[in-house]
Amino acid sequence: MRLLGLDIGSKTVGVSVSDELGITAQKLETIKIDETKYNFGMRPLKKLVRQYEVDGFVLGLPKNMDGTSGASVARSKAYGKRLEEKFGLPVHYSDERLTTIESRRVLVEDAGIHDRKKRKQVIDQMAAVLILQNYLDLHRKD
């Protein structure tokens, strides 16, 4: 089963994809969105769904550190509902607390990307990878 992982932000959506066996996640791209113009990035997502023959989505659920839900959780769930309506595919959610911080650490410490502009270009994709990989690891059938 192939899934797209999404890190939903206010201006961008980081996108990752799983392999066909649902074992690993890899980064794909960052899609610019503009909620004020009702541009939610559905056109580029449609291309990716077709290209990778996707079976569903995994969205990050940005809960507060104490486990409560805030406005960002509502945004992710609303985005998930749009995806279900547009594509008719299942949408799953994965706790994304600290994924952006972890992404930044990986990019600086492991990949050696110290340039802030370069990091900004891939941080949403990396967060999407972590969201999807966490989901895959939790749901792996050994």
Swiss-Prot record:
Database matches in InterPro entries: RNaseH-like_sf (IPR012337), YqgF (IPR005227), YqgF/RNaseH-like_dom (IPR006641), YqgF/RNaseH-like_dom_sf (IPR037027)
GO cellular component terms, A-Z: cytosol
Gene Ontology molecular function, alphabetical: nuclease activity
Protein name: Putative pre-16S rRNA nuclease
Principal subcellular localization: cytoplasm
Stated family: Belongs to the YqgF nuclease family.
Domain of life: Bacteria
The species this protein was found in: Lactobacillus helveticus (strain DPC 4571)
Gene3D superfamilies according to UniProt: YqgF/RNase H-like domain
SUPFAM superfamilies linked to this entry: Ribonuclease H-like
TM ranges: none
Function per UniProt: Could be a nuclease involved in processing of the 5'-end of pre-16S rRNA.
Entry EC no(s): 3.1.-.-
Assigned keywords, A-Z: Cytoplasm, Hydrolase, Nuclease, Ribosome biogenesis
Localization of this protein: Cytoplasm
GO biological process assignments: rRNA 5'-end processing
